[in-house]
Regions:
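Serine-hydrolase catalytic machinery in alpha/beta-hydrolase-like enzymes
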Residues: 22-38, 45-115, 217
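Acidic beta-to-alpha connecting loop that harbors the catalytic carboxylate
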Residues: 176-179, 207-209
Length: 235
């Protein structure tokens, strides 16, 4: 997965000081790491974004993106959901076996994040990459605490459509030439959101595969930021 170095919004505002720490919570009696990136807020509750890595298990790129979002005023939490199953990286059989467990881990992570003193519990979004996008979308169909989802080259598991209680505003970002998660997943999700009259935005990048080159990342980063600012705005 390739990451751009600076996918951030040009601004005349001074960037806030970011406090970074690694916290833990319990899920299934196991300690789960969650990396927090908290901007200074003068005591004001902040919108929160929980970020989920992909099947490779490498959080480095996710953490870079988290730090950039925190610079824009979001409390961002990078979830090490593989801790629940002692997974390093996940192939298809591993994903099928553990997906429900990771779903519960994400549910517990939201419960943990909404109790954090810096967080406005009414303004929580999920942001996921690949497998993390699948988990984010699946959770959003049953968890009313999630107000928005940004999904990079993922999709909604077909099984979740049978148990779907809700959907929320969703940003779909996908490569047209994705050979890992076919772009049909993006269009299927778009169709479902339209059928349910749920606000969404979609950008399909011509020629892009699973993971983006720098120029695409810059555009995707801008879109993600604008979407989160729109749907996590203070009421």
């Amino acid at each position: 997965m390739k990451w751009c170095k600076q996918p951030k919004i040009a601004s005349n505002l001074q960037m806030p000081t970011i406090t970074q720490s690694q916290l833990t919570f319990e899920s299934g009696s196991k300690p789960i790491r969650i990396d927090a990136y908290i901007p200074g807020s003068n005591g004001t509750s902040l919108p929160a974004v929980i970020a989920l890595h992909g099947a490779g298990g490498d959080v480095a790129g996710t953490e870079k993106f988290a730090a950039q979002l925190a610079e824009q005023g979001f409390a961002v939490y990078v979830l090490h959901y593989f801790d629940r199953t002692d997974t390093q990286s996940a192939d298809k059989p591993t994903i099928l076996r553990n997906f429900p467990v990771w779903m519960k881990t994400l549910w517990d992570a939201i419960s943990f994040v909404e109790k954090q003193p810096a967080v406005d519990r009414e303004r929580i979004a999920l942001l996921g990459f690949s497998l993390g996008a699948y988990l984010s979308l699946a959770n959003s169909t049953i968890d009313g605490r999630v107000k928005a989802v940004v999904e990079f080259f993922g999709g909604l598991p077909r099984e979740m459509r049978l148990f779907m209680r809700r959907l929320c505003p969703t940003l779909i970002l996908h490569g047209e030439a994705d050979a890992t998660v076919p772009v049909a997943e993006a269009y299927n999700l778009q169709q479902l959101l339209e059928q349910k009259s749920i606000p969404y935005e979609i950008k399909i990048y011509p020629g892009a595969g699973h993971g983006f080159e720098s120029e695409v990342w810059r555009d995707a980063g801008q879109r993600a930021l604008h979407f989160l600012q729109k749907y996590l705005a203070a009421s």
